[in-house]
Every structure is written in structure tokens, then in C-alpha cells.
């Protein structure tokens, strides 16, 4: 399911009750990337409570066509504990308050990955240094380096 369809699903069921911010209300791309890197670092360290602290309450999680609205840090930490893979960030692109991160999946401390070596992607909606939503999306195609003959 593409990100736009997934986001539309989340909006249609009222999961993203907070309206999208205007460009003036966004964190800087550098600050947004810092939040995504902190999330990845905490996930890889199996610091599920620490990862949960990066999220606003409530927070929305969309994965595999299912959407969850989690209300507490304990719920968010449990969700992280159930993730099967750790991963290394390959790239992060930011547009407004949306950051798309591509990861190379791996086993980790207390994690037995079902697809080590494969790439996965997620879109993070970040505002004021907190993650409001995490949406698994298809890995975007590599950026082209220009026209080819």
C-alpha cells in the first residue's frame, strides 16, 4: 500500500486528528533528521522505552494495512518491542514535517529479523521534536542522477 493511500486511510478513520502544519510550523530538516536518527539508534539498542519517549501522545502507527492509535508511552514501547528487525539508515529525505527513511534491515540485540539485508522504509511525521506518526511505506526508487540517453 503506497504512502498516499496509507495516509488517506489514516485520515479517513480519524487517526490523524491534528491538522497538517503549515510550512512555517515545521521543524528544520536537520532537526527532523535528528529525531529519526535518535529513533533508529534507540530501536537498534533495544531501548524501547527510550524510543517511545520520542513520540507524541497519541501517536499513529500504520504497518501492513493496519493502523493503530497508541495513547501511552507503555503502549508505544510495547509496539517497538514487537518489531522484528533492527536496521541501519541508508537515507533520510524531508519534506515539511514528513521524513522518509530507508533502512537496511538486520538482526539486533533481542531481535531476530525476518528479512536481514533487505531494505525497508518508513515515513515519520515530526512536529516540535516529537513523532506524531510512523507509517511503513514501500522503499522509494533511487533518485535518478538526471536524464539518460
Which residue stretches match the model-derived regions?
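Hydrophobic pocket/interface hotspot
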Residues: 39, 50-52, 59, 75-76, ...
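Short beta-strand segments enriched in hydrophobic/aromatic residues
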Residues: 55, 105-107, 138
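Short, low-complexity N-terminal intrinsically disordered segments enriched in polar/charged residues
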Residues: 11-48, 53, 57, 143-148
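Residues that flank catalytic or metal-binding motifs in active/ligand-binding sites
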Residues: 55-57, 85-88, 120, 127-130
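Bacterial N-terminal signal peptides that target proteins for export
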Residues: 1-8
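A short gly/proline-enriched turn/hairpin at secondary-structure junctions
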Residues: 54, 59-69
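Surface-exposed, charged secondary-structure patches
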Residues: 73-116, 123
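Short beta-strand edge/turn micro-motifs at domain boundaries
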Residues: 100, 117-149
